[in-house]
Regions:
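Short linker/helix segments within small regulatory modules
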Residues: 203-209
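Auxiliary alpha/beta "docking" domains used to position bulky ligands
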Residues: 1-164, 203
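A broad, structural surface signal
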Residues: 48, 89-100, 169-173, 209, ...
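Iron-sulfur cluster-binding cysteine motifs and their immediate structural context
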Residues: 170-194, 200, 211-221
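Processing junctions and N-termini across compartments
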Residues: 159-165, 185, 212
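A short, flexible beta-alpha/helix-coil linker loop
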Residues: 156, 197-198
Length: 221
């Protein structure tokens, strides 16, 4: 649980990301950046955010097919039903139960609204943002779908998670395209997930060989 207050401000990091054009063709990040940096613009009556994560990794080695060049690799998260529909159904049910318990109104979001799920989840104690900028959980690694429930009532905060990365650089070292330009800084225009999902144009020749047989997304980091 995270309290919405003036200290819940992600504007500096977001502005830097956008100014460097590290978001590439994801113009939707610019259009509602004010909502991302201030959750109350999204809903001015919101007082607390309940953040949630659901593990989506199954028993498989997500990198085992990299050497089999006659096969295309699809990111683990998209090998099942659309997670938006599954999580929204769960969120709706949970939100109604919370509203009855706390006598409050609510709005719930999963990935499609301008909510900074990762830093909010860190403040809410689910995990910490690793050097690859993904959220890392002690129990589930980076294999989490994140969602949130906004409520118009103050709830006691949970303890924020701290950064446990230390001197580890595994995520940086494993990135095929060097998209993690420095610890905690991602250039999405070099990221294979961006290039194979969000990018609609021609992929730079220098990046094509590095992408290998990944045809939709990337799970390396």
């Amino acid at each position: 649980v995270v309290d919405i207050n003036p200290n819940l401000d992600f504007e500096k990091e977001l502005d830097e990301f956008l100014e460097k054009n590290h978001h590439g063709e994801m113009a939707w990040m610019e259009k509602r950046s004010n909502c991302r940096s201030n959750p109350n613009i999204l809903w001015d009556e919101a007082q607390s955010i309940i953040v949630l994560g659901i593990n989506y990794h199954f028993e498989c080695n997500s990198l085992e097919l990299l050497s089999e060049k006659n096969k295309g690799i699809i990111s683990v998260y998209s090998r099942n039903s659309d997670y938006h529909k599954i999580i929204k159904k769960k969120l709706k049910s949970l939100s109604f139960e919370i509203s009855k318990l706390l006598n409050c109104s609510f709005k719930y979001f999963v990935d499609t609204a301008p909510v900074m799920e990762k830093p909010i989840s860190m403040k809410g104690g689910i995990g910490w943002q690793g050097k690859h900028t993904n959220l890392v959980s002690k129990d589930f690694g980076s294999w989490l779908f994140l969602s949130s429930i906004f409520v118009d009532k103050k709830i006691n905060n949970t303890r924020p998670e701290i950064d446990h990365c230390g001197s580890c650089s595994s995520c940086i070292d494993v990135c095929p395209t060097n998209a993690i330009v420095e610890p905690y800084k991602l250039d999405a225009t070099k990221c294979i997930s961006y290039l194979t999902i969000e990018h609609k144009g021609i992929i730079d020749k220098n990046l094509r060989k590095l992408i290998g047989n990944r045809i939709y997304g990337c799970d390396d980091c």
